[in-house]
């Protein structure tokens, strides 16, 4: 017996932003699964604004006092920082736009062996329960993290079905919720 969840592939902007933020913070969650999900878009935008202010400050100071080594270094560091963070923000926005435009059907099948993710005309992922490091409940998705860089997310509207299936079949997986949620082992009753 297995649990099959089908989706038309049309999700909200907030859902995809959360999934992208989870993907970009994967390594941080693997080190500390309970950590709070940070909004990378906002953080990067604020950092870029600060770098632009410092760049402007460096250029103005350079014109007023002359371009000394310190000001030139400040300008170069700001330009490099703006380039790196600008590229990261562009990549994240591109991933969001691509996700919003992708209307392919998605099927997630959960059984005693593990989780199978299939996207119509495309990606197939198989994750065995022994590979699942933990599952984490976020505001929009329930996400399964593996040690080998695979992340499979299920819309939170299916959380109860998934958790009931895991409990009923005695599958051992550590589940971590949003802040305030008590960490449980889903296979134990």
What are these regions (language model features)?
Residues 1-51:
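N-terminal membrane-targeting/pre-transmembrane regions
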Residues 2, 114, 139-141:
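A generic structural signal for beta-strand entry/edge sites
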Residues 3, 125-127, 150-152:
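Short beta-strand segments
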Residues 36-102:
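Alpha-helical transmembrane spans
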Residues 85-126, 134:
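Conserved beta-hairpin
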Residues 128-129, 145:
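Structured extramembrane domains adjacent to transmembrane segments
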Residues 130-138:
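K/E-rich alpha-helical interaction surfaces of small helical-bundle regulatory domains
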Residues 141-189:
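A membrane-cytosol interface segment of integral membrane proteins
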């Amino acid at each position: 017996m297995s649990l099959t969840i089908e989706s038309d592939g049309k999700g909200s902007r907030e859902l995809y932003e959360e999934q992208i933020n989870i993907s970009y913070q994967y390594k941080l969650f693997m080190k500390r699964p309970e950590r709070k999900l940070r909004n990378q878009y906002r953080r990067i935008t604020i950092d870029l604004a600060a770098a632009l202010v410092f760049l402007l400050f460096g250029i103005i100071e350079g014109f007023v006092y002359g371009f000394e080594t310190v000001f030139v270094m400040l300008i170069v560091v700001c330009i490099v920082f703006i380039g790196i963070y600008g590229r990261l923000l562009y990549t994240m926005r591109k991933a969001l736009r691509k996700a919003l435009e992708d209307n392919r059907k998605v099927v997630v099948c959960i059984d005693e062996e593990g989780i199978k993710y299939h996207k119509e005309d495309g990606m197939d992922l198989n994750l065995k329960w022994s590979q699942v490091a933990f599952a984490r409940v976020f505001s929009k998705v329930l996400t399964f993290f593996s040690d080998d860089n695979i992340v499979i997310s299920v819309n939170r509207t299916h959380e109860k079905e998934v958790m009931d299936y895991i409990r009923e079949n005695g599958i051992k997986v550590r589940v971590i919720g949003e802040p305030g949620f008590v960490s449980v082992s889903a296979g134990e009753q």
